[in-house]
Amino acid sequence: MLVAVSDDDGPEQIDWTARKIANLRIFDDDEGKMNRSVLDVGGEVLSISQFTLYGDVRRGNRPSFVAAGQPDHARDVWLRLDEALRGHGLTVREGRFAAHMRVSLTNDGPVTIPLDTAVMARPR
């Protein structure tokens, strides 16, 4: 799980995100349908703080990261999100905040789902 935090993120966004991650049915059931959550399959979460997800490339050729949260706030929200996930019964492993890390991931199938707390309150 790659996590980007904005300065607008707080307890409401943390709770919503943790609940979604714990309960999203994104793993296949016995019939091959995405019908099982990470909790259902006994999975774990690798949580990586990734401010570059807020990279804005609409202008120029150098990304702007002004939408990313200030480091102290971002670290606090990221850690609180990980604790909220643990509160849902998940095992959470963490990367190091603000560190240069090599992280490998394998997308299993054509599924990547962004969760954006800025859209959580919009009507469907």
Predicted features along the sequence, with ranges:
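Short Lys/Arg-rich amphipathic alpha-helical segments
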Residues: 1-91, 108, 112-114, 119-124
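Beta-rich nucleic-acid/ligand-interaction surfaces
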Residues: 99-104
